[in-house]
A protein has these predicted regions:
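Conserved pre-ATP/AMP-binding loop-to-beta segment of ANL
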Residues: 18-20, 144-161, 167-168, 194-205
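Conserved AMP-binding/adenylate-forming
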Residues: 33, 48-94, 209
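Conserved AMP-binding A3 loop
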Residues: 34-38, 157-184, 385
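Structural core segment of the AMP-binding/adenylate-forming
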Residues: 78, 82-143, 148-149
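Conserved small/polar residues in nucleotide/adenosyl-binding loops
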Residues: 162, 373-380
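Conserved AMP-binding/adenylation subdomain of ANL enzymes
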Residues: 180-205, 212-251, 257-269, 276
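Gly/Ser/Thr-rich phosphate-binding loop
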Residues: 250-254, 262-324, 337
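Conserved ANL (AMP-binding/adenylate-forming) active-site segment centered on the GW(Y/F)…HTG consensus within
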Residues: 323-326, 352-375
Length: 385
């Protein structure tokens, strides 16, 4: 079982090197570009070489990423963690006030960016111009051949900012141990796909349309690289149908707004626009049971995923295709402990975050004796109220 990004890198080089790793629509070529896992691994090593050359010992140092989904984004995010640094993927859609707060909090050694945010918010270059780097900066370096496992897989590896619906976003601290402990929640549902449908999931490709700062996109990318499947990247929802049409994809992680669009096409007889899409993993909110039931009747396999950034996306999943079970949370992660406290779901286990970055009080509000309280409401940890 692969339990770290370094082990995943080695797997790319030794077992799945000749498989297609990622595809995307290349605007300049006006067509699809792709890389195999062998090239993916080499570019990860190049990124490690870049960090070492520019910043020396990067263990524990933060590297911010502010860009749209791209192949380079993937390399920057995972290369950072393989090098022992901390990846900080930021939400390109936020304003300067929010981004400047998050950059000030995390104090990155560099900000990898594609220019879009800087064009919209000139204050980025004015304030952080000396540490801005292009997303493809690693391409000029030779691959580092002496990459090894990080010393501690329980150490901080990612800072993922929450949506911030009740004030400033909180920086969720996640380790590689958190990430890989959650992998069964993303891999096991595909055993159910085989059982229910008989489809050969070994040949599936997945369209990644959610931004990489979203926990679902990040964890899905890791899980698919473990199994050696192909990931098709969509960097802008306005090009969703173009990209879906250009890159055949069986699987997609969806949030409610995406599901509604897909549902509309299916119910209006426009399923051909979906180019073979047949498996939907639904997360981020409760979904209308009627929509799910209708999609199943039309031949889709639908899995409902329940998790938080604070649980590395883990929690529970419902892969039943029977209408009477659509409102159930389904299976839980048997490696974790669950309990209800005054109607609130609590969870303890290896996928649970390390805490909120530089926010011990906020951490204490939701974690009591390693037990995560899933409600965002403040409470007294002594009384759990």
């Amino acid at each position: 079982m692969i339990t770290s990004l370094y082990q995943s890198l080695c797997n790319m080089e030794t077992n799945i090197a000749d498989r297609v790793a990622l595809r995307w629509y290349d605007e300049e070529k006006q067509g699809v570009a792709e890389v195999h896992y062998a090239q993916y691994a080499q570019d990860l090593r190049r990124f490690v070489a870049f960090l070492r050359a520019e910043y020396g010992d990067v263990r524990g140092k933060r590297v911010a990423i502010l860009a749209r989904n791209s192949y380079q984004y993937v390399i920057c995010m995972y290369g950072t963690v393989i090098a022992g640094a901390v990846a900080v993927p930021l939400n390109l859609g936020k304003d300067w006030d929010a981004i400047s707060y998050e950059l000030g909090l995390t104090e990155p050694v560099c900000i990898l960016q594609d220019g879009e945010f800087a064009e919209r918010e000139p204050a980025l270059a004015e304030t952080y111009g000396s540490i801005l780097k292009p997303m493809d900066v690693f391409a000029a370096y030779e691959p580092a051949e002496d990459v090894t496992e990080v010393e501690d897989l329980s150490a901080l590896a990612f800072i993922m900012f929450t949506s911030g619906t009740t004030g400033r976003s909180k920086g969720v601290m996640l380790s590689q141990k958190n990430l890989f402990s959650a992998m069964p929640a993303f891999l096991d549902p595909f055993d159910d796909v085989k059982k229910y449908t008989g489809w050969n999931t070994d040949e599936f490709s997945s369209l990644s349309a959610l931004p990489m700062f979203h926990i679902s996109a990040m964890t899905s990318l890791v899980s698919w690289s473990i199994t050696g499947h192909s990931i098709n990247l969509c960097n802008n929802l306005k090009y969703f149908y173009r990209d879906l049409g250009a890159m055949h994809s069986e699987v997609m992680a969806v949030v409610p707004v995406l599901l509604k669009s897909i549902y509309s096409d299916v119910m209006k007889g426009r399923r051909d626009r979906l180019n073979g899409l047949c498996v939907l993993t639904c997360g981020a909110a409760m979904f209308d049971p009627k929509i799910l039931s209708d999609m199943m009747e039309k031949g889709f396999f639908v899995a409902q995923m329940y998790g938080l950034t604070e649980t590395c996306g883990d929690g529970a999943w419902n892969s039943s295709q029977e209408a009477k079970y659509l409102t159930s949370v389904g299976h839980v992660d048997l490696s974790c402990e669950y309990k209800l406290d005054d109607g609130e779901l609590c969870m303890r286990g290896n996928p649970i975050m390390l805490g909120y970055y530089k926010d011990p009080e906020g951490t204490a509000e939701v974690i009591d004796a390693c037990l995560l309280y899933t409600s965002p409401s403040p409470r007294d940890p002594k009384t759990s109220r």
